[in-house]
Amino acid sequence: MAASDSSSAGSSTESMLQESRRFPPPAEFAKDAHVTSIEQYEQMHRRSVEDPESFWAEVAEGFHWFEPWTKVLDWNLPDAKWFVDGKTNLAYNCLDRQIDAGLGDQTAIVWEAESPGSDGQFVVEHWSYADLHREVCKFANVLKAQGVKKGDVVTIYMGMIPQLAIAMLACARIGAPHSIIFGGFSASAIRDRVEDGQSRIVVTCDGSYRRAKIVPLKDNVDEALTMTDRVDTVIVYERTKHDGVNYIDGRDHKWDALMADASADCDAEQLDSEDLAFILYTSGSTGKPKGIMHTTGGYMVYAAMTAKLTFDLNADDPNEMYWCTADIGWITGHSYIIYGLLPNRVPTLMYEGAPNEPGPDRFWDMVERHQVTKFYTAPTAIRAFMKWGDEHVEKHDLSSLKVLGTVGEPINPEAWVWYHEKIGGSKCPIVDTWWQTETGGHMLTPLPGATTTTPGSCCRPMLGIDAAVVNSDGEEVPNNTGGILVVRKPWPSMLRGIYGDRQRFVETYWEKVPGMYCPADGARVDPDGNFWITGRIDDVIVVAGHNLGTMEIESALVSHPDVAEAAVVGFPHDVKGTGIAAFVITQGQAPSPGSDAAEAMKKSMSAHVAKELGPISKPDQIRLTEALPKTRSGKIMRRLLRDIAAGNPITQDTTTLEDRSIVEKLQASG
Ligand code: WT7
């Protein structure tokens, strides 16, 4: 529910981090971009928020509609209907449109397996629009033959293989909303989602590969299905073909066997613009996961438009090769591996495995071999690459790269600059994209040909997005004053609800600041009009009457030469009310706890923060640690850190932790 430190949510957060570096778009890049200057962006943005209906109508006209809409928007807060009465199909716009235009032979997906083939070369597959279309139609017929009808929720739990894309597009083709579960989740997560989504069918794999080991996906499904009797059908794609996989007669079917007899003719269902396209569960920091609902027309239009603008995609550039390193099990993968990319007719690279398999240079080796032009990853990955060492990057020619993207959490300026210099060769614009599972697509981001970027800022609102930083009464706060980020107008890919929980939808997003969408992030706007995310509003800490964004302190810490990564939380403090606790991963081996070297290092880190941000931001506790408690999606579990910092017993659920042993280590770290 609402922020635990909600006392601070409405008042102003003081922003102390000053960043003066500016990176204008390279002229060479800007001249051919979709949006070529900040003036052009500003003029387009103004028009898009002043007259949204004509703006969105124009964007939506670039897609195939079986029947046109009668009204662009029907808005009854918090319920939006976009492109009312319009009939369309996501899979049709991804595949058939390219084929109809005579371009079916072009590459839609390039897939690379984690392990090499028997010849020692990495296994790469090129899937054209026509190839995908054929398999998608066949699998759509398989689903129908298994009794799946329009509106039935299909659970998908697979590794990062082309068949995952095929399964999701097949669902989209027949109007069966998919509910994709990240392949790193366990049996109980499957059970919860199957139950919540009332899904009777699961599509999975026997196993998937991760760091050359087999993740037993089918075993996990089997275990989940001992805990619910909702599922009567399981379809299994055999990826690993390992021994011991159990098949239950009547319930379990092999993908290949079903596909062998399936027809490749399957008309795309003419779906209503507001038909449910998918459910995707997002954890929220407490309670049971929320099934975020996205619908067909609005999501399609927004995902594809934002992909095109943010990455400046160009279908007519034969060298274009886009790579997003996320897993399709997250919204980033839904929107920016599949649904935003295929309608733009740009090849999307899909990688099966881990970034350090077989070595820490895997990503850079792939960028070089595939001549990747647009690359999209997360700050946590960037910091890992920094820690692994520049030599793994320097081995490779990365000169094909043109735009670099980041998403998922605030990027600290040190990581931003490293990404810019080491990966981008100081020539690639960086797009720091702020958005959420709930928003469906990018909300705040630079446009690479238009925006002068500054490290750590996600810059400007996307076209059509009316974002602002306000106090809890919804009034805009002055520049450089922290407040609550809100979106004041509806946009096409906004969530339509939480599956089965109307009240939670209304309370979570629409009641914190009445009349506005509230994503629960704190932010400020600098005098140039650039947005800075200061962290979740429940991460804001109030120290001696000053409100501080934890992210700013983390950034200051990470700019210390001995710090690789830092997480900052508040803890009860006798004098200040709230003290600042910092959990720090050091560069290289940490000095042993309690040693003079450790104490000296902590002192130097404290002094550094005081120098960067002012003494008020100086941590009261620093704990040197070798790891931070993270969920499998890479988010730091801050509530857990708060309990550790306060010396409280751990009562919360730690089952989503990537490595559970780390809790004891942190408690011992003192
Ligand atoms: C939360 C949403 C959107 C796909 C990945 C995460 C944080 C996301 C940024 C960014 C600062 C960011 C926010 C947001 N976040 N991108 N560029 N800068 N913070 O999706 O799991 O729905 O999480 O991630 O706190 O609310 P998600």
Describe the function of each predicted region.
Residues 181-206, 221, 368, 375, ...:
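AMP-binding/adenylate-forming catalytic core of the ANL superfamily
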Residues 107, 234-236, 247-281, 288, ...:
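Conserved pre-ATP/AMP-binding loop-to-beta segment of ANL
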Residues 169, 173-257, 371, 378-379:
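Structural core segment of the AMP-binding/adenylate-forming
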Residues 91, 109-169, 186-191, 251-257, ...:
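Conserved AMP-binding/adenylate-forming core of the ANL superfamily
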Residues 339, 343, 373-377, 386-453, ...:
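Gly/Ser/Thr-rich phosphate-binding loop
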Residues 300-321, 331-373, 387-388:
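Conserved AMP-binding/adenylation subdomain of ANL enzymes
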Residues 460-464, 475-509, 548-550, 648-650:
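Conserved ATP/PPi-binding loop(s) of AMP-dependent carboxylate-activating enzymes
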Residues 122-130, 269-270, 277-301:
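Conserved AMP-binding A3 loop
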